């Protein structure tokens, strides 16, 4: 919630800087984390705002849809393979977050439609994204983006549990194991590139680990609800919570250190990082 407030403050207090940060394919796609977070926390906001928490959910859906439309017009209708990054998952699969908690707002039919859309669009995007990332040169600044491969599974698993009339335990286990494999890959990738220098894309590691932990929470709840839980799985998922906190705190600290450096040095470094990501049009 604090990070959401800071993002809103940046939009109003520094609109030029905000616009500069989202006028590129990577910047705009990563901004999808804002509406995705709104959708995620909307259920938790019920304690503070009662039924008015619906407005958080609707705002998240509307903003995410707007990003999807703008992104499609700018970067799909004018397609260039150099602008294809794993962050596209946040734009096109991000709307699936609303399928996870749609039942809390009586939007079951909408949620099922978005759920199937998320599966369909994720399958379509996997090949071009992986082809672009592994077959073409990738800058150091763009390497953390590969961690966003966790987004589709991290959204589809909890949505499947919440919306499917008959849940297949085998399918759940396959998705859960897939998430664990991606998590291991993300952590290894993060460690290997930890000393490459700080880039804003480091936040992708935190997003990735967090969404794995978020999805695993639903998996654990399902197992416990059907009396299939085990201490090992419980410890693994609790470990993911701790890991999510550590990675998130580390990335936040690195970001603050970067921001608090000399303003001119920071401005120059931001420009250099932007150029490395091929964000300048």
Each predicted region: which residue ranges?
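Structural signature of hydrophobic alpha-helical transmembrane segments
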Residues: 1-5, 50-65, 109-123, 170-181, ...
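An N-terminus-focused feature that recognizes amino-terminal "leader" regions
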Residues: 2-25, 255
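Juxtamembrane helix-loop boundaries in multi-pass membrane proteins
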Residues: 14-42, 57-60, 73-100, 115, ...
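Helix-coil boundary and interhelical linker segments in multi-pass alpha-helical membrane proteins
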Residues: 44-54, 100-112, 160-171, 219-235
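Alpha-helical transmembrane segments in multipass membrane proteins, preferentially the mid-helix core
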Residues: 67-71, 100-101, 124-133, 155-164, ...
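Aromatic-anchored, glycine/proline-accented short structural segments
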Residues: 117-176
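Long, repeat-rich segments with strong aromatic
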Residues: 161-197, 202, 211-219
